[in-house]
Amino acid sequence: MKNLLLICLLVSLVSCQGNAQKAKETKTYAVQKSDAEWKAELPEMAYYVLRKAGTERAFSGPLNDNKKTGTYVCAGCQAPLYQSEYKYDSGSGWPSFDRGIDDNLEYDVDYKIGYPRTELKCNKCGGHLGHAFNDGPRETTGMRHCINSAALNFIPADETP
């Protein structure tokens, strides 16, 4: 009876580990700075979003309503992330895109709110951008990249090098 109880306990412990977030390998990014350097260089909200994986309030970011033609780049390292033709109004309160410039995006999984979500990061500096959801426009990719304005800078098409 003791052995059966012990086996049941071990099985339940192993089962609980199934949903636990596993330790991740440390990735080396092309752009590396100390936390102090990021904090000194970035505006407060950009630092909070990019470096601490925060989220700005819905409808508070200036790029949510931007309709200009151009490129959205990482506010931390200026890597091109999104083209304006892929931006659409999702009604979520954050800039939304149906796709990005894949070579510059990193897809990760986070469990910060208790269930898995696809986190989007800049592949050059590791900055947190937002999350990807599969509730985007069906006529294109079906994806919604829900991105914090504070994580982006916008470069108008007529200023692109």
Predicted regions and their residues:
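Positively charged n-region of N-terminal signal peptides that target proteins for export
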Residues: 1-5
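C-terminal motif of bacterial Sec signal peptides marking the signal peptidase cleavage site
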Residues: 13-15
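Sec-dependent signal peptide cleavage junction
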Residues: 17-37
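A short Gly-Trp-Pro
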Residues: 29-30, 39-73, 79-161
